[in-house]
C-alpha cells in the first residue's frame, strides 16, 4: 500500500497539478478537492475505500462551504468503492404504506454523513468540472453524484460492477445543472447508467432545480439496467440530446419519469428531448441479477411513465435486435401527456408487434 489519506490530502491541499502513481491507496475518509486542482491518477492507481468506513472517496470543498468550486479536473485511475465491506443504513419507513420519503428533500447533515446511500464521489456546487478516463469499481450506490453544476464534462467512464447492490448508478446529475456533456459510459450498472434528475428524494436531493442544455453521447453495455433516465418532479428537464446508446437493457434504454408522490405544486415537464441512433435489445438468456428476470422481461426499451408531461420529443434511427422478448420498443403509459412527438426510422426485429404502444395522450 502507498500513501495514506493524510498524504494524498496534503497534495490536494496544494492545488494545481496533483499526480498519483501506480499503486493501491486505502482511503478512510473523504478526500477533499478544491478549486483550480487537476488530479491525475496513473492507469493502475487504485483508490480503495477502507473497510466499514461507509463514506465517499472524494468530495469537493463546496459541498461543505456552500460556495462554488471552479476548474476541477479528476482524471484516470481506478476508484474502488469496496461495497462488500460497507453498510448502508435503511431509510426509515421506505417502501411501507404512508412512506413520504419521496416527498421530502434530503437533510443536508444526513447527505454529508452519506449513511443512507454511500455515494462514492460527490461534487456539489461546481463550475467547469471535468471527470475523465476513470474506472469505477463496485460502489455501494452511485459512482458519481454531481449537483448544482454549470459547465461540466464527464467522459470515458468504465463501470466495473459486481451488480450486487441496488442503486448502483453510474453518472447521476442532480438539478440544477446546465451546459454539460456526458460521453462514453461503458459497462454494466445496476440502476441508471446516466440519470438527469431535476428533483430527487430524501436519498439524494441535496439541491434541486432545472436541468438544461445537456448532451449525452455513448452508453455501451451487455447487461444494462436503464441507459438514460430523465426525471422531473417540480423542475423541468429540457434541451437534451441523447445518442449512440448500444446494448441490452434489463429495464429501459431511455426513460421519461418522475417521483411519487404526485403534487399539483410540483409539475412534471420534460421538453426538447432529441433521441437518436440507438442499437438496443432486451437481454437474452439468463438475466443477472436473477431478481430482475421477471420485471425486466416486459419493460419497454423507451418508456414514458404515467403522469409525465413531455413536449417536443423526437426519436429516430432506432434498431432493435431480435431478442424474442415480449416487451414494447416504445411505450407511452396511460395518463402520460406528450405534445409534439416525432418517431421515425425504427427497425424492430423483435417480432412481437409492439414497436409503438400508445396508451397515453399524444398530440402531434
Task: Describe these PLM feature segments.
Residues 1-364:
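Extracellular/periplasmic carbohydrate-active domains that bind, remodel
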Amino acid at each position: 500500500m502507498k500513501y495514506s489519506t493524510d498524504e494524498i490530502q496534503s497534495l490536494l491541499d496544494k492545488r494545481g497539478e496533483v499526480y498519483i502513481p501506480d499503486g493501491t491507496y486505502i482511503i478512510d475518509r473523504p478526500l477533499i478537492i478544491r478549486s483550480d486542482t487537476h488530479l491525475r491518477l496513473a492507469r493502475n492507481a487504485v483508490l480503495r475505500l477502507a473497510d466499514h468506513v461507509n463514506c465517499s472517496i472524494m468530495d469537493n470543498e463546496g459541498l461543505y462551504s456552500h460556495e462554488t468550486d471552479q476548474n476541477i479536473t479528476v482524471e484516470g485511475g481506478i476508484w474502488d468503492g469496496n461495497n462488500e465491506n460497507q453498510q448502508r443504513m435503511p431509510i426509515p419507513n421506505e417502501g411501507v404504506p404512508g412512506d413520504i420519503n419521496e416527498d421530502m428533500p434530503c437533510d443536508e447533515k444526513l447527505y454529508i454523513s452519506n449513511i443512507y446511500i454511500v455515494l462514492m464521489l460527490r461534487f456539489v456546487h461546481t463550475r467547469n468540472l471535468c471527470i475523465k478516463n476513470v474506472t469505477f469499481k463496485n460502489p455501494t450506490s452511485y459512482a458519481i453524484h454531481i449537483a448544482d453544476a454549470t459547465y461540466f464534462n464527464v467522459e470515458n467512464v468504465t463501470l466495473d460492477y459486481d451488480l450486487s447492490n441496488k442503486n448502483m448508478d453510474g453518472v447521476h446529475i442532480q438539478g440544477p445543472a446546465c451546459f454539460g456533456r456526458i460521453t462514453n459510459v461503458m459497462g454494466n450498472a445496476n440502476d441508471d447508467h446516466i440519470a438527469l434528475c431535476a428533483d430527487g428524494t430524501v436519498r439524494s436531493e441535496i439541491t434541486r432545480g432545472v436541468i438544461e442544455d445537456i448532451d449525452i453521447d455513448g452508453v455501451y453495455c451487455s447487461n444494462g439496467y436503464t441507459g438514460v433516465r430523465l426525471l422531473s418532479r417540480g423542475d423541468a428537464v429540457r434541451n437534451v440530446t441523447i445518442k449512440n446508446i448500444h446494448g441490452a437493457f434489463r429495464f429501459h434504454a431511455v426513460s421519461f419519469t418522475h417521483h411519487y408522490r404526485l403534487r399539483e405544486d410540483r409539475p412534471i415537464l420534460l421538453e426538447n428531448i432529441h433521441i437518436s441512433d440507438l442499437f438496443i435489445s432486451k437481454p437474452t438468456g439468463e438475466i443477472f441479477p436473477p431478481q430482475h428476470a421477471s420485471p425486466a422481461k416486459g419493460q419497454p426499451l423507451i418508456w414514458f411513465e404515467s403522469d409525465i408531461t413531455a413536449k417536443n420529443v423526437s426519436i429516430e434511427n432506432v434498431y432493435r435486435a431480435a431478442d424474442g422478448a415480449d416487451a414494447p420498443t416504445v411505450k407511452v403509459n396511460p395518463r402520460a401527456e406528450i405534445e409534439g412527438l416525432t418517431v421515425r426510422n425504427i427497425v424492430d426485429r423483435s417480432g412481437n408487434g409492439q414497436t409503438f404502444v400508445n396508451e397515453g395522450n399524444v398530440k402531434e
